[in-house]
Amino acid sequence: ELPVAFDALTVVINPQNTWARTLTVAELKKMWEPGAQGRITNWKQIRASFPNEKLMLFGPGADSGTFDYFTEAVNGKAKSTRGDYTASEDDNTLVQGVENNKGALGYFGYAYYAAHKDKMAAVAVDAGKGPVGPSLENVTNASYSPLSRPLFVYVRDTSAQRPEVKEFVQFILSRGDLVSEVGYLPLPKTAYALTLKHFQDGKLGSVFGGVPKIGITIDQLLAMEAKL
């Protein structure tokens, strides 16, 4: 289990939407929970001060890890969500849906928001301590919760001794600077050094088993990985 980056799941709206630049986790749940299906269809139902505007939702399909993490973080259970939204595994389809509909709201990884900032606005999410937007700083200081998540590379123990696998792992853990180039958020250098040492020492096991803990911080991640 090799932690390589953090991602900030980003809730986005159409640029013409001037009323929902901040939303609480409870309001997101009100939109996305299973009981909202066929019932919550207007922005005014989310907050009384919002306009009478049709709510249109866009998000990844059920086979996506982003879907699993978002539904657990917001609704309390992975894969628990309303079904009457526009789902796609192609993030470009989601971008276009939000871009072309004033009342749209969607979510995906930070990379797609960063690549299309001119077409949409990011929502600052309030988990109880005030609204916080997605950024490297806010993921690093643990204030962007619960929508920040660690990303991992998993290596089979029987493959770890192959020269090309060793070379690949050495490369990805020594070039954390490349992480930001593809829209993800790099870990501290100490994290990459610790992970590389674990790999070189042949430490096996997984803290998360492929399912990261909701709301975990970088410091918590490092502490847990250090115990492997």
Mark where each language-model region is.
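Flexible loop/hinge segments at secondary-structure junctions
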Residues: E1-L228
